[in-house]
UniProtKB/Swiss-Prot annotation:
Protein name listed in UniProt: Actobindin homolog
Coiled-coil features, chain-numbered ranges: none
Pfam families documented for this protein: WH2
Role description: Is able to bind two actin monomers at high concentrations of G-actin.
Disulfide bonds, paired cysteine numbers: none
Keywords, alphabetical: Actin-binding, Repeat
Residue stretches making up the WH2 domain: 35-52
Organism of derivation: Entamoeba histolytica
GO molecular function, one term: actin binding
Signal peptide: none
InterPro entries membership: WH2_dom (IPR003124)
Length: 85
């Protein structure tokens, strides 16, 4: 709404100071740079993976003896048309 925003354009905002939170929270901690070449060589060597068992639950949960009833839509429409005449 233009009327509501008209007063905001002329408003003067107060100056505010923000705290620098980029420094580590834990004191006396050094962050070491990792050796990039060592990391890449480790990736290239590969790692033997453990065998994983999976539980495939993607199948629908419908009983095996479930039946789909016959579609009686045609008969219903015929009854409606017959009574409408």
């Amino acid at each position: 709404d233009a009327k509501a925003l008209a007063g905001i354009a002329d408003a003067k905002l107060k100056h505010t100071e923000t705290g620098d939170k980029s420094a580590p929270v834990i004191e006396n901690v050094e962050i070491k740079k990792g050796d990039r070449n060592e990391l890449l060589s480790g990736i290239k060597e590969g790692k033997e993976l453990k065998k994983a068992e999976t539980n495939d639950r993607s199948a629908p949960v419908i009983p095996a003896d479930a039946k789909v009833q016959e579609d009686n839509r045609g008969a219903l429409l015929a009854d409606i048309q017959a009574t409408a005449k």
